């Protein structure tokens, strides 16, 4: 796989009144060509600062950023402007020109790049069709829904045929149904146009719906990185557990007693009656503390937190049984949910 974005040792701080605020601290990141790469974290983790450093909307303090084989930090202003043509970007707030039509908004980057008007219009109409807004070329932003505005922003970001599209919380202001439609469009763009996409989000559902790889950012550092399925199956950090299991699991009140086990299953296993099988085969009951299912890249995944019996022999029978089923499971330590 070819690396298209390589970040090493990236750090960025801001003056926060009496003390310096560290937004990024020694961040390493690798994105491969063709990825839909997610960066997820809680508010204030440094996500937006990271994505804005990639095209130098923010200037890093330390570290290297290699994009398309170029050291972005070494470029002068003229060279940077040329490099940015290969890096499209969309934002939460759309940033459309309110007094310009959809067609005029999409044409705008090409006007700046001194395209001929006829060529710019042809390209804009192609992209407006791609994002599903044919027939609305003359409409203005005030006449559009939030989802439509984001589609215009996506079309505008693609005008100069970038190899990379950066999405900074691009679905955060949208309702769930509209979010799914925008993510479906991004997946289409990735597949049909070969655009590598980086999605910044605080929503695990966005990662599950669209991404093949993910980094988890916490308190200015990358704490986990890998394929979405692997991170989902084996979260190693507290923040990953919190993001994957969700708030419901985080507030589960555990009763004192037996060991707690996290069970993860996918594909056909997601529909197997695992708890009933445990009871029948091990002659012992478990206490379900939390359970949910979700779909990642078209595959149904499920997970449970269960509490085993106090009786050590019964608990061991269950662990032995689970080992034989091939289901992914791990014993959870106190405080890890």
Locations of regions flagged by a protein language model:
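Conserved ABC ATPase "signature" region
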Residues: 70-71, 107, 111, 118-135
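Short coil-to-helix segment of the ABC ATPase nucleotide-binding domain corresponding to the Q-loop/switch region
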Residues: 100-107
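Helix-to-loop junction immediately C-terminal to a conserved catalytic motif
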Residues: 55
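ABC ATPase NBD coupling module
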Residues: 18-19, 72-88, 117, 231-235
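Conserved signature/switch motifs of ABC ATPase nucleotide-binding domains
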Residues: 139-142, 160
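ABC ATPase "signature
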Residues: 225-226, 234
């Amino acid at each position: 796989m070819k690396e298209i974005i390589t970040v090493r040792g990236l750090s960025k701080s801001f003056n926060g009144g009496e003390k310096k605020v560290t937004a990024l601290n020694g961040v390493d990141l690798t994105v491969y060509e063709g990825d839909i790469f997610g960066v997820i974290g809680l508010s204030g983790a440094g996500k937006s600062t990271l994505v804005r450093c990639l095209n130098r909307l923010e200037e890093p303090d330390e570290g290297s950023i290699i994009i398309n084989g170029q050291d972005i930090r070494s470029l002068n202003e003229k060279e940077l402007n040329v490099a940015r043509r290969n890096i499209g970007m969309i934002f939460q707030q759309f940033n459309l020109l309110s007094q310009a039509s959809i067609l005029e908004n999409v044409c705008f980057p090409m006007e700046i790049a001194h395209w001929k008007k006829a060529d710019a219009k042809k390209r804009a109409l192609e992209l407006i069709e791609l994002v599903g807004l044919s027939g609305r070329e003359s409409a203005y932003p005030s006449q559009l829904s939030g989802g439509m505005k984001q589609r215009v922003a996506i079309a505008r970001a693609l005008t100069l045929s970038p190899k990379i599209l950066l999405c900074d919380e691009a679905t955060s202001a949208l309702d769930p149904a509209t979010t799914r439609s925008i993510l479906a469009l991004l997946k289409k763009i990735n597949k049909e146009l070969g655009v590598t996409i980086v999605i910044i989000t605080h929503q695990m559902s966005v990662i599950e719906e669209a991404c093949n790889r993910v980094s988890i950012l916490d308190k200015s550092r990358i704490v986990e990185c890998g394929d979405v399925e692997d991170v989902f199956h084996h979260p190693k950090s507290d923040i990953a557990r919190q993001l994957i299991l969700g708030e419901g699991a985080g507030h589960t009140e555990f009763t004192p007693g037996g060991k707690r086990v996290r069970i993860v299953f996918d594909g056909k296993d997601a529909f197997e009656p695992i708890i009933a099988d445990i009871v029948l085969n091990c002659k012992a009951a478990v206490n379900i503390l939390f359970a949910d299912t979700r779909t990642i890249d078209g595959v149904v995944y499920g997970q449970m937190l269960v509490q085993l019996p106090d009786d050590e022999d019964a608990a061991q029978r269950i662990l032995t049984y689970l080992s034989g089923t091939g289901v992914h499971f791990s014993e959870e330590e106190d405080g890890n949910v």
